Amino acid sequence: MFAVIKTGGKQYRVVANQVLKVEKIVGNAGDVVNFSDVLMVGEGDNAIIGAPIVADASVTAEIIGQERARKVISFKKRRRQNSKRTRGHRQEITTLRIVEILTGGLKTKTATVKSNEKKAAAPKEVKADSVKETATKTVKKRNVSQKVEAASESKKD
């Protein structure tokens, strides 16, 4: 069975256990990703073409790793202008392994998702006695003549 999925502005023909590289998908290695934008599903001569997507079809994939593609050099030269510019770009890509292709509204198998998220501990209650009040210092505003007097006194010392 094969499927045509849409991700990252491109279309990919995939089969089960296929490894492919796509535009970056947020996630860590071991995470499971579900693609619901299935444009076509087929097996042998039988094919179901969506308009634009196939209803109740999905493709489940596992993220193998995150990496960067080879550097693409962009070079511009303006002749007789003594002007040139070289730039490089490395696109971030995700390597996926297709786990299963589901059609007809079948439920996905419960997949174990490895997550590095730590559960947030409940905030501790703070007793009112332990909270200290901050001391506030009030400063009296001085006018210009007082500032001049204070400056002249500091020079005398």
From Swiss-Prot:
Any single GO CC term annotated in Swiss-Prot or TrEMBL for this entry: ribonucleoprotein complex
GO biological process per UniProt: translation
Sorted UniProt keywords: Ribonucleoprotein, Ribosomal protein, RNA-binding, rRNA-binding
Matches recorded under InterPro entries: bL21-like, bL21-like_sf, Ribosomal_bL21
Biased composition (Basic and acidic residues): 115-135
Source organism superkingdom: Bacteria
GO molecular function terms noted in the UniProt entry: rRNA binding; structural constituent of ribosome
Region called Disordered, residue ranges: 112-157
Family stated for the protein in its record: Belongs to the bacterial ribosomal protein bL21 family.
Protein's job: This protein binds to 23S rRNA in the presence of protein L20.
Subunit: Part of the 50S ribosomal subunit. Contacts protein L20.
Protein name: Large ribosomal subunit protein bL21
Native organism taxonomy: Bacteria, Pseudomonadati, Pseudomonadota, Alphaproteobacteria, Hyphomicrobiales
